[in-house]
Structures are given as C-alpha cells and as structure tokens.
Amino acid sequence: MANYTAADVKKLRELTGSGMLDCKKALEESAGDFDKAVEILRVKGAKDVGKRAERNATEGLVAVSGNTMVEVNSETDFVAKNSDFKEFAAKVADAAAAAKANSQEELAAVDVDGQTADAALQEFSAKIGEKLELRRAVTLEGDKTAVYLHQRSADLPPAVGVLVAFTGEGEAAEAAARQAAMQIAALKASYLTREDVPAEIIEKERSIAEQITREEGKPEQAIPKIVEGRLNGFYKENVLLEQSSVADSKKTVKALLDEAGVTVTSFARFEVGQA
C-alpha cells in the first residue's frame, strides 16, 4: 500500500515542477517523506541537466522589452508555447533591458529573481525536463524603437523578431518605422547602408561578379560596368535602405522613410535557431 496520497503527489508536482511519474517514484523511494522526496527530485534534476546539455535546443522564442531583444531556446515547440516558458522569457527580457545586455555573456549574467539568468535557466530547465539556452541579446541606442514579432503559426510564440531604432515624430513616422521592421523580417536585410558593408564582403562579391561575367564571355571593356551593376544588385538585396519596399515596390525603403520624416539609426533581426 502506498504511504503517500494523491494530494502529496499534487503538492510535490506544484513545488518542484516535476512530472507525475517522477513525483510518485520519489515519494516511494522516500517512503512518503515529503522533504526527502523533494531532495531526490532536485538531485535527479541536476543529473538530467548534464544529459540535456548534449542535446540541441533549436526551438524557442524571441522576446522584446524596451530597446532590448532576446532569444531563448528550447528543444521542442511544445515547451516554446508553454505559458511558463513564455513568462520566463519575458522576465529574462525585462532583466536584460534593465541591464542593457548586448551579448550572450551579458544576458547570462543579468539578475532574474535574485540570481543570474543562467542559474535561473538551469533551475527552470530541471523543472521542465528540456535543455534550454539563453541564445543572444541586443540593446539598441535611441529613444524610439519599432518592434515587429512574427509567429510562424497562431499557436506558437514569435520565432522572428525585429527591433528598429529611429528618429521621427508622429503616427506616420511610427507606422513607417514599423513597416521597415516588417520589411527586415521578410527580406532579411543585413546592413542599414552600403557604407556598413565590410570591405572584405564587397571585395568578395566583386570578385565573384567578375568571375561570373568573364565566364559568360562578355567583352573585356564591358566587364567593369557589368560588375558594378551586379554589385549594385547585391546592395539592393542586402542593404535595407536600398531594397524595394514590400509596401510599394516602385519605391525604395529609404524613399518611404524620407516621406515620413524617419531616419533609421540601427536595427537587429533575430530568428529562432538561426545565426
């Protein structure tokens, strides 16, 4: 006969966050000693963390608080859409915003309920039984930010997040900045202006364009102009201000922002599980 009750199992589950079967086993092993059962589950959780460390966490969500955006990963989308996980990620985002975290290392060190985010993560990981990761954080400078969070389906949390820092006044400016954020989410701009593209990237693209042009057998005198045209194509694809707007394909993003009196000063794009 069991030396514990269903109420004991329920209480143990609520206290530790462990599964029903694990709680029953712990109570059986402890001969009904509740405190001993809690200790057994804590030890089991610590052991499981080591096993989970070998697994991959490629699901999760993107959360934003103020000028700060974070990515927190889980192993499965089942956990990603769990309300406790979303609440935990929101706490991490708030703490990261307060600390102006701007890297994974800074994110791991922020204070969440009196302990580091990394310690809180390990504790929460033991509770839910999945590997979790504090993937990255970014904080943009500026008084105004536009946010766009994209869900892949209605039952899942945001998997793509974009944060845009900008200057501009009024509703039209805010709408234009948000449209820019949606543009970045969809077309994945890597740079704000062509001046932001590293020299080594430009040289690599120029070299590839020249090689392709020569292999096509173009006249030697025409090669420089063709190469520059292809390089401009690279800019139009990867530089935000030079992209054609998804809202009005006849205009560039820069043209629409100028019309609204908006200057984008920086942006960041996170996609769950991506670099």
From Swiss-Prot:
Annotated CDD domains: UBA_EF-Ts
Annotated keywords: Cytoplasm, Elongation factor, Protein biosynthesis
Main location: cytoplasm
Subcellular location as annotated: Cytoplasm
Gene Ontology CC annotation, any one: cytoplasm
Listed PANTHER family: ELONGATION FACTOR TS, ELONGATION FACTOR TS, MITOCHONDRIAL
NCBIfam families referenced in this protein's UniProt entry, alphabetically: tsf (TIGR00116)
Family membership noted in the UniProt record: Belongs to the EF-Ts family.
Protein function: Associates with the EF-Tu.GDP complex and induces the exchange of GDP to GTP. It remains bound to the aminoacyl-tRNA.EF-Tu.GTP complex up to the GTP hydrolysis stage on the ribosome.
Protein name: Elongation factor Ts
Protein species of origin: Corynebacterium glutamicum (strain ATCC 13032 / DSM 20300 / JCM 1318 / BCRC 11384 / CCUG 27702 / LMG 3730 / NBRC 12168 / NCIMB 10025 / NRRL B-2784 / 534)
